[in-house]
Amino acid sequence: MQKLTPRQSEILSFIKRCLEDHGFPPTRAEIAQELGFKSPNAAEEHLKALARKGAIEMTPGASRGIRIPGFEPHAANDDEGLPVIGRVAAGAPILAEQNIEESCRINPAFFNPRADYLLRVRGMSMKDIGILDGDLLAVHVTREARNGQVVVARLGEEVTVKRFKREGSKVWLLAENPEFAPIEVDLKEQELIIEGLSVGVIRR
């Protein structure tokens, strides 16, 4: 990575802080407000410079489409087990305190890649691959997903578990149950945040 200017380092630190504190990156407007820029356009120019230097990667058309290569927030402590996330409050980060029901004494390294939290599954939309209502889905925090992977995705104020498929700016969130229709998302019009990948299931 090329050397950053002091201003670029400030922005990169702010992005990392947002990822650690909230679980997702800031918008251009939030960066502008934090750093004292007159407009989000100024933040955009700095982000483009950071991308050219390899410090970040940007997803076109997404207001929070910023990724720091190799940066994975919210790594779980092996001794503490994994937090169990229940119903996610609208607009709240997945790992916000109000979402955590309990802690499960299981080593995160049991999963590959290692799990960062357990999400309590609600509904039967993924039953055909053995993910049932009430199961605990082990999730590895990442903002990237490849076609065919089972993801935890945030669409608007809803968090859902589905199979991921993308073609250009179009994304389909596919159920594994014929009773549920695919969810189609145009990234030019809607924001979709990948919260993580499914790396296992625990049934109690």
Curated annotation (Swiss-Prot):
It is an enzyme of class 3 (hydrolase). GO terms for biological process: DNA repair; DNA replication; negative regulation of DNA-templated transcription; proteolysis; SOS response. It comes from the Bacteria. GO terms for molecular function: DNA binding; serine-type endopeptidase activity. The active site is at 125 (for autocatalytic cleavage activity), 162 (for autocatalytic cleavage activity). InterPro entries: LexA (IPR006200), LexA-like (IPR039418), LexA/Signal_pep-like_sf (IPR036286), LexA_DNA-bd_dom (IPR006199), LexA_repressor (IPR050077), Peptidase_S24_LexA (IPR006197), Peptidase_S24_S26A/B/C (IPR015927), WH-like_DNA-bd_sf (IPR036388). The record marks 90-91 as: Cleavage. Its EC number is 3.4.21.88. It catalyses: Hydrolysis of Ala-|-Gly bond in repressor LexA. Keywords: Autocatalytic cleavage, DNA damage, DNA repair, DNA replication, DNA-binding, Hydrolase, Repressor, SOS response, Transcription, Transcription regulation. Residues 28-48 bind DNA. Pfam families: LexA_DNA_bind, Peptidase_S24. The keyword Transmembrane does not apply. SUPFAM superfamilies: LexA/Signal peptidase (SSF51306), Winged helix' DNA-binding domain (SSF46785). HAMAP family: LexA. Belongs to the peptidase S24 family. Represses a number of genes involved in the response to DNA damage (SOS response), including recA and lexA. In the presence of single-stranded DNA, RecA interacts with LexA causing an autocatalytic cleavage which disrupts the DNA-binding part of LexA, leading to derepression of the SOS regulon and eventually DNA repair. Homodimer. NCBIfam families: lexA. This is LexA repressor. It comes from Pseudomonas paraeruginosa (strain DSM 24068 / PA7). The gene is lexA.
